[in-house]
Amino acid sequence: MAGRGVVEEIERLDPEKDFERISFLSTNHDFPWDVEQSLSLAFFKTYGIPSISALLDETAEFRDRPQKRYDDTELILAEILENGIDSERGREATRRMNRMHGRFEIRNDDYLYVLATFVLVPLRWNRRYGWRRYTRQEEQASLHYWRALGKRMNIRAIPDSIEDLERWSDEFERANLRFSESSRRVADQTLGLFLSWYPAPLRPLLRPAVLALLDDELLDAFGYHHPPAWLRHGLDLALRARATIVARLPRRSRPRLMTRERHRAYPGGYRLEELGVPGLEGRAPG
């Protein structure tokens, strides 16, 4: 499937019933790179909430096994999207995710905020940097997809519209986004992971570029200096230029499947039962 074929199929589908198919087509055919980048930013955004960062800091996973933690999260979400929420592998991936979280007392609002970032950050990225804009079906399907997954994680009171979810998220941030030492540590560890993927001489140049993608309120929550305006502007222009170029390239003929790609923590491939935090399985959240 290529070209207009993806959009044409999406336009024939119902976002309330066919949200899994729409999300798969959108993510794996048309926007694999964009979704990967925006979800990385979404994770960063959650670290600015002290109650979330304190838990991540306590587990020490980002300190001791940052690449495995990153790959496990990416692969669990990919297993669910590529195979289906209620497929055998999708259910097992969700079960493992629930058990990873189940030994900790996590507030429903913290769960809901993480889910909200997974909906809202990719939407905002697409509106600014997508090579085409999401259709209304894609936006609605994203909400229904994450609502369905959230319910299987026993997350309560998930708003049923993007507008309500955005209002809730903004209010939550105003009340909770602030500096904490745990936020700084987890942000430092994650930033160190991202930079480790590039040659050492480039890392001092790439660090401010990554920070330029974060908003000022989040930078303040991490205790980071704000990057210069010219860097933000230059990066914005570069990402918009990329979108213009990608729009003129031939469309992908086959989906990009994250589960089939090589991952640094699993150079020889992975088994589903390897995903998750060792020794931290317990009850599912309730």
In which residue ranges do the predicted regions lie?
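Mature, function-bearing regions of proteins
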Residues: 1-286
